[in-house]
Every structure is written in C-alpha cells, then in structure tokens.
Amino acid sequence: MATPSPTKTTWKLQEIVAHGSSVSSVVLGKSSGRLVATGGDDCRVNLWSVNKPNCIMSLTGHTTPVESVRFNNAEELIVAGSQSGSLRVWDLEAAKILRTLMGHKANVCSLDFHPYGDFVASGSLDTNIKLWDVRRKGCVFRYKGHTQAVRCLRFSPDGKWLASASDDHSVKLWDLTAGKMMAELSEHKGPVNIIEFHPNEYLLASGSADRTVRFWDLEKFQLIGCTEGETIPVRAILFSSDGGCIFCGGRDALRVYGWEPDQCFDTVPVGWGKVCDLAICNKQLIGVSSAQSTISSFVVDLTRVKMTGCAPQGPVPAEMPISQPAPAGTSLRRIYERPSTTCSKPKRVSPTSDDEEKESRAEIQNPEDYKEIFQPKNAISRTPPRNSEPFPAPPEDDTSILKEPVAPIPDVVTPATSNKNNTEQLQRPPVAASTPIVCQEPSPVPAPQSKPPVISAARNEPIGLKAADFLPAVKTSSPTEVVDDEAVSQIRKGHDTMCMVLTSRMRNLDTVRAVWSSGDIKTSIDSAVAINDLSVVVDLLNIINQKASLWKLDLCLTVLPQIEKMLQSKYESYVQTGCISLKLILQRFLPLITDILAAPPSVGVDISREERLSKCKLCYKQLRILSPLVKSKASQSGRYGSAFRELHLLMSGLE
C-alpha cells in the first residue's frame, strides 16, 4: 500500500485587501469559524468568508473610523463601535440596521454581546463601560472604576458577570444584577489586552502587554497560574472546546498552555504576523491577522497539535471528538449554570427608524454567498443546522518539483509574457479546488514610492535602516552584467559604516550603563541626553516606563524635550516609547503641576517650594509646546492615531 503524502499542520488560506484604507479591527464568528468581520478607517464594516476572496456584505453608516466589531453568538447580529463613541447594530439576515446607540465621549475600544439576552456591553477610551438594551434603544447601566481605556469586555457563559480589561493593568469583574464591582484582579505589570472565560468552570484567563497569560480562580478571585515565554504582548487567546487547554496566538507561533501546573504543551510555528482573533471549528483552529489594509486567514490542524501532557497520536478519527483530561486541581471548581429562560432564541428586535436605515445601508456585494450563509437560517430545512466541512490540508512542500534552477534576479526586470505567467503560477495560494479565487482580481499592493512617515516595528524584513543613508549620494552607471568581484563589493557596501554606527551605539550604552549602576536615574538620563543619540534615550525610557515609581518631577523636565523628538520620529518604536512616556507624565504629574501653579503664593521664603514651582512652570511650558503636536497627530488613522487621541484627551486640562 502506498504511503499517503504528508500534509501540513498549518497553512495559509488566503490574503485579501479588506478595505481601501487601514484595517482597524478584525473579528471571527465563534459559532461557525467561517465568518470574518473587518472594520476600517474608511468607516465601513465588511463581512467575508475566511476562504473566499469576495466581500459578502458591506455595512455603512458610521461617519468616523470603526474601532471595534463583534458578532453575537448566533452570528445573526453584529455591532460596531467608532471613534466618535457611537455604536451601530445590524441584523445580518435582514441586511438592515437595528439600532444606533450614542453615549460614549471617545473611541469605543471593546464590545461584547450578552450570551442570550438583547444586551450589548461597550468599553471606551473615556474609561466607562456601558450596558445597552438593544430592544429599548438605551443605556441600562454605566460601570465606572477603570482609570484608562477599556480594551476588552467579556460576558460570563451564564450571563451573570461582565469582565473588563484595561490599560490600567487591571481586570475587573462586575455583577450585572447588583450593578457593582465584585473583584479587581491587578497582578499584571502592563496593559491587559484580552480576557476569556473558561467555557465551563469558574476560571478566567487574561493576556497582557507584559507578555504573560494569567489564570484566575473566580471563586476565590486569586491568581492560580501564569505563563512565560511570549516574546510580544499577548493579544489573542482562546480556550479549547472542552476547556482542557488554552491557545495563545503569538507573532510567529501558536502556543498551547495548561494550568495547575503551568506548562506549555506545544509550540506550532505559524507565519500569521499580528494575529487578531482565533476560533475553533471541525478540529481546526482558524486565525486571522491584519497588516495595513489586508487581512490573512490561517488554519492549524488541531489533530496534530499536542494539547495535553502526552504526545499527539496522529490524526483523530472523524467519529471521535477531541478531548483532553481536565487539568489537575480543577475538578472541585464550580461550573457555570445558565438560568432558565422562556425561549432559547432572543426576541427579534424591531428595526430602527427609516432615517437611520437610509444612513446605514447594507450593501450586499455577493448575493450568492449572502443567501447561502444568512438566508437558509429562516428555512425549516436548516433544522438541524448545517455542518461545515473542515478545510482540506495541502501536502507538505516538496522541493523536487523545482525542475530548473532559479536564475539570479537582475537589477532591472523588463516585463515579459512568460515572466508574468510564471509569477502567477508561483503566487497561487494552496487552496482547495472548491474555493476559486477568480471572482475578483485584487491587484497586489504596490510598493510606496515615498518613504512612509512611520516605519513599523512589527515587520518581517529590515526597513528604513540602510547603510547608504549615512553616505553621500553617488551617481551610479547604467546596469551592466554583474561579475563575482562586483557582487562581493556590492554585498560589502556600507558594511564598514554600519559597523561604525553599531560600535558607537554600544559605546554610548556602556557609558550610560556605568552611570546607571550607581542608582542615579536622573544622572543617567542626563548622560543619555548629552550623548545626543535618541536611540539610547529610547532604550533607557523603555526600562523606566516599566516602573512608574521611578518617575520624578525633575526627570520629567529632562525627558519632555526628548519626547517631542520621539513623537516626530519616523520609527514606530520611537513614537510608541514617546507616547507611553508622555502618558505616564500626564497621569502622574499634570494634576500636581496644575495644583501648584494655581496655589496662592505662600507667606515668607520657602526655597523648596520655589524650586518646585520653577520646575512646574518649565514642565507646563513644555507640555504646552507638545499640545499642538499631539493634536495634529490625533487626526491620523490607525493604531497610533488612537494613542494620540488618548493623549489629547489627557492634555485637555492644558487648554
């Protein structure tokens, strides 16, 4: 019997241009694992199938960029929040808007549907959480307690609790019936990006910018576990269907963790970049990621992933469900019990007014896919519901198919028909024959002619740092045939200059490190500023920002001029460090500065007060200089536009 060719554990389904501008939010439908919703800076919400390149439906109505999107459990409703603070709820079966909800004063950062009621929770940059009754078109309750933006909201499986994660490093649990906070979980050392309830037990997982996933016992409200090993902030986590493990999507890999005891069961390399959301369907994990205006979908075969302390035994037969033993120590933990309700399906909400319906249109761009996905839900023949087939796994890459060696790429490539055909053949993704990609012709995104204003820190290749940037421009002759000596010379070009740059940076860091070892942070910052190398200042601030107690008023006076340079830098990492540092200064010292400046003069001579007053005046002056810069960048789109809008909100007291 011939041995079947091995198939891949992970593979890429497709990559599509989702919006005409940057993609700001991507979410998967958790029920089917087949629907994707994207929100963009073009103020639209687009619906996609994870394995088809055509947009199913485009929802309009928002007048500002969409910041967050969320499906309900049945994938019949979708809610989207915008930068202006408004929410819009659409009925996907009827292809029309249901509600427009207004009330937040800033960006809507997080959303979640109640598991079986007509309620939506929203968290905002204004630090407030609001519970909305979609049927009655109003705010039911407002939860206050966070001091920074609310990044994630999740209802408990029984619908009695609401968990919120915030940039203030905390996770809060709210009792919906009592309308008050039950507990605050504050062990994280960085902003909390994502939270998920265990599907059965009283357990909560939270992922943070401190690169850890923490597990919380919701009976005792105590930390019971913490993972280590993530290299970037955690933004996507998902419990397995039976709750035996948790999946964590990193930049280059999918990690499978257990708790009690803490352990990493498996690490699966996946090249999905910035993963945004995860879902499980048919023993496959679906992941979606975004980069600028494009989104990509990936599949991980869970039958080949180790999800317990034992090694996987190969593909699982179709009739056997995937199951793992419960982690040790969890057998005594309570499980959720859904309270009895009169019906298993929420009552249909009447559509909103005609005026809002005209403003918020649902443009069905692919009628066939729309009818296939949404219309059969109203038919009797759909009982029991359809079971989608798993995506077929492509075979492992075989290098033997390369019959001819690849010729070296010349400096200038002239267009030719044969080259075009070869390119199309090489770029065809490994998709099943039942999912054609000829319905539309998304042209590849052309390389920008001008240098982008900000160079992303999340990239797969070096960008922006070229040795030629440090050398005078030299006119080159017309391209000729490259010989070996010229090729070697071209490869080594700029090497000496780059070595000098790196050697100088290492010398500067050694100088600052010698001062830092004495424990004088102010002197360390002064020496870094005196060196006149902004990269050294950025490295030093990245350490100081991790511990807010290190900040002092005289340190602010030195750092604020450097922050102005960082915010105007073309490098994303510099801008990010500048935003974090300025945010810490505004939160910790702006109230102190304004109080001291507003206080009446004291009687007599107080030297320490005079020094403090002088420092406050200088800091206030520098903050006033930064205010127009922050305001101008607050109108930008994308992730850093949101960060600058938050800074602008904090600086409103200066005006």
Swiss-Prot record:
GO terms for biological process: cell division; microtubule severing. Its main location: cytoplasm. SMART domains: WD40. Disulfide bonds: none annotated. PROSITE patterns: WD_REPEATS_1, WD_REPEATS_2, WD_REPEATS_REGION. HAMAP family: Katanin_p80_B1 (MF_03022). Participates in a complex which severs microtubules in an ATP-dependent manner. May act to target the enzymatic subunit of this complex to sites of action such as the centrosome. Microtubule severing may promote rapid reorganization of cellular microtubule arrays and the release of microtubules from the centrosome following nucleation. This is Katanin p80 WD40 repeat-containing subunit B1. It comes from Xenopus tropicalis. The gene is katnb1.
